[in-house]
Structure formats: C-alpha cells, structure tokens
Amino acid sequence: MSRNEVKEGRLADFIQRSVATAIERDLKDPALRSLTITEARVSPDFHIAYVFWISQNRDEAAKALERAKGKLRSRVAKGCGLRTAPTLEFRYDELQDRAVRIEERIQEALRQDEEMEKQSSEKGFAGEENPYR
C-alpha cells in the first residue's frame, strides 16, 4: 500500500467521523435525525470526498444535507490538516437497499422450496410401491 493510499484511508475515516459527529451534535435539522453515514471515500488528489449515507426519509435527508454542506465542510476543514478541505459530495448508499432486496429474494426462494417440499411429500407414487427401487 502506498503512502498516498494510507493517507486517503485516514482522511476518509476522519471525514466519516467528523460528518457523523457534526450531524449528531451540531445540526438541529429534524430531517437528519434518522440519517447514518455509512462510508467516506477520498479522491486520489484529496479534492473531493464522497460521503455515503442512508436514511428512512431519503428525499428530505438529501435536501437537508445539501443545505448543511457548507457547515459540514467547515467542520472537516478544522481538523483534516490539508491546505484546502475537500469538497463534500453526498451520495445515497445503494448497497444497503440492494442487500435488503437480496435478503427478501432469498427468503422468498426458501418459502417456495418449503412449499414444493411439502407438496412433494404429500404425493405418492402411482402404484402401491416405489417403482424406482
């Protein structure tokens, strides 16, 4: 791992913690109460930080994040140790939704398997005994 990759990782961790803490403690917007910061990534040139989030009220939270973007960037700038703080780009974390959909599909497939097993166990062979013995 190169020195830059290590720095990117540390900066991303710092940004994730700073943004999450600022949302929890400093911002009073009710739309951000159910918001969770799931991850942060930093571009190789440290100019852009992609902050991934999830929330129950997606549209309201997205608007609230846009309104708070300047305050959050100021909070990051205070402790990041860079000449200029990275621009924060907020992106909804689709991974969580995909995981939920996959889990639902797995549960549905298991239910169908159980139904088929139940139906096949209730049915017998056409004759008195198993012809395949």
Predicted regions and their residues:
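Charge-rich, low-complexity N-terminal segments
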Residues: 1-48, 54-133
